[in-house]
């Protein structure tokens, strides 16, 4: 059926918007941490992991961490990290908090707590949407899911945005629809390249293709070699990825038309 009713009336777009919303909130967390406890970022692998969110939800700032009961702080970190954060790690963080140059700003601390709560809620919503997408795509037999690096969610977004491939007479027509036609890339300057891109084609499809291309270049030797070739020609990474995305579109178009699974020597 019409790409499973365009993945049930564009659940993929809804997911895209939710993920984008979450990304903005994560940027806000980074900004607030830079104000309240800037040293923390160097003490953890990422600000956006469960243990850090647990820490900042309970102790939203260096001053709160420095004055916290050490045993309670250690318990919070140990539980949230499933035992990976030991008492020595707790001590390291608390000592750093004690000498932090971070500001003590109650309003910012409250904003940090609320922002983390919003991210957690979005995580649940995105997970629910992804489960619905997975249920739909599990009933589809599109060959694009056989391409290394294309997961269910990104593949679903591509299929939903394209719809009926027979509406496109050629791969070039599909490239134009995605805003990836050769004329889009007249300038070698990355900024100009993006300025052209944003005005043309489906931004949802373009996003899906660019992100899919990045993963395909990681997992598929043929695409990886193609990306390296473009980079060796002096092209910026994002411009090289745009070339990989165009190659991916041609591959997807051919596969959908033939119904054949991915061949490594494409």
Language-model features: where?
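A detector of single, family-specific signature residues
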Residues: 1-4, 8-266
């Amino acid at each position: 059926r019409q790409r499973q009713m365009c993945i049930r009336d564009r659940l993929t777009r809804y997911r895209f918007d939710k993920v984008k919303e979450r990304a903005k909130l994560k940027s806000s967390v980074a900004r607030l941490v830079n104000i309240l406890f800037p040293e923390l970022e160097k003490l953890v692998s990422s600000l956006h992991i469960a243990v850090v969110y647990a820490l900042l939800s309970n102790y939203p700032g260096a001053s709160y961490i420095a004055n916290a009961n050490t045993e309670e702080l250690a318990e919070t970190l140990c539980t949230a990290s499933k035992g990976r954060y030991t008492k020595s790690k707790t001590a390291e963080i608390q000592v750093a908090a004690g000498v932090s140059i971070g500001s003590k700003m109650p309003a910012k601390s409250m904003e940090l707590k609320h922002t983390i709560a919003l991210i957690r809620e979005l995580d649940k919503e995105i997970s629910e949407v992804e489960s619905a997408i997975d249920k739909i795509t599990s009933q589809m037999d599109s060959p694009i899911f056989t391409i290394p690096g294309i997961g269910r969610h990104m593949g679903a977004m591509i299929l939903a945005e394209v719809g009926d491939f027979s509406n496109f007479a050629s791969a070039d027509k599909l490239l134009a629809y995605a805003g990836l036609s050769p004329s889009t890339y007249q300038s070698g300057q990355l900024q100009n390249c993006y300025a052209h891109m944003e005005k043309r084609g489906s931004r949802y499809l373009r996003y899906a293709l660019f992100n899919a291309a990045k993963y395909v270049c990681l997992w598929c030797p043929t695409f990886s070699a193609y990306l390296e070739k473009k980079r060796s020609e002096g092209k910026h990474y994002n411009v090289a990825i745009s070339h990989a995305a165009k190659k991916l579109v041609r591959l997807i178009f051919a596969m959908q038309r033939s119904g054949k699974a991915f061949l490594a020597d494409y």
